[in-house]
Regions:
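Bacterial Sec-dependent N-terminal signal peptides
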Residues: 1-27
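GH16 jelly-roll
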Residues: 23-265
Length: 265
């Protein structure tokens, strides 16, 4: 058997194994959740995301107008900034993360969310290594559970690493997929972080598997480590494009976040 055929067989077997893990909910035990039923954000777990220079972070704001607890959901908003003297960003967006506070020790992470569409809107749910000091980006990887652009009826599910970015091995194996969503309703976005693969799913249906493979190239699968979770609304950027302020405000409703671990056999 040739090496290419052997590698293909291994990847296929991993995908089948991962698919079974993703589809069988009985294999998982709920170990933590936040259902956002309180009167405010639980700051023992969450913080507001920091403003930064990257496209995803350059409108992040602690402005209370970007946050609301409503109907058992946390609502993250994107708004027009009407006071450029106090903040030079033309738009302000809400975002939260568990950085430095709460680690997700692999397993299954799911988020139930409803996303409003708007031109230039870019809501995201994603994971980065909890140990930021020893896992500088992209060496520790990035797991994008959900990104949605504008009024799209699909979500992007992606992973990044030193292997895919620096070594440009983003198709060996493929590193992302798109999955259909209910654009005006709640959807459950999830990923299983397993020793041998990442398994993405939407509404309980497996959408994509990224396997660990045998390779002499470094950094192919750094993901099986504790992670922190980011949930943020963003407006504008080179990927999503220009914002139409007439379509604002725009909202991202978070119903719950759940973390599962495999049941012991």
């Amino acid at each position: 058997m040739s090496n290419s055929k052997h590698s293909s067989t291994i990847i296929t077997l991993l995908c089948i194994t991962s698919m079974l893990c993703a589809c069988s909910r009985s294999n998982w035990k709920l170990v933590w959740q936040d259902d956002f039923n309180g009167s405010g954000i639980d700051y023992t777990v969450w913080s507001h995301t920091d403003r930064g220079n990257a496209d995803w972070a350059n409108t992040q704001s602690k402005d209370p107008r970007c946050y609301e607890m409503r109907g058992g959901c946390l609502v993250l908003k994107g708004i027009v900034n009407d006071n450029l003297e106090s903040d030079t960003a033309h738009y302000l967006t809400g975002g939260i993360w568990t950085k430095g506070k709460h680690a997700f020790d692999c397993g299954r992470i799911e988020v139930r969310a409803r996303l409003q569409g708007a031109k230039g809107a870019w809501p995201a749910i994603w994971l980065l290594p909890f140990d930021t000091e020893n896992n500088r980006w992209p060496n520790g990887g990035e797991i994008d559970i959900m990104e949605r652009l504008n009024h799209d009826t699909i979500a992007y599910q992606t992973m990044h690493s030193y292997y895919t970015l620096n070594l440009k091995q983003d198709n060996n194996p493929p590193h992302y997929t798109t999955a259909p969503i209910k654009p005006n309703d709640f959807n459950v976005y999830g990923v299983d972080i397993l020793p041998d693969s990442l398994v993405f799913h939407v509404n309980g249906k497996r959408t994509f598997t990224y396997p660990r493979i045998n390779t002499d190239k470094p950094g192919q699968f750094p993901f099986y480590i504790p992670q922190y979770l980011l949930i943020d609304m963003q407006l504008g950027g080179s990927w999503v494009g220009a914002v139409d302020p007439s379509q604002l405000p725009v909202e991202m409703e978070i119903d719950w976040v759940k973390h599962y671990q495999p049941r012991k056999k």
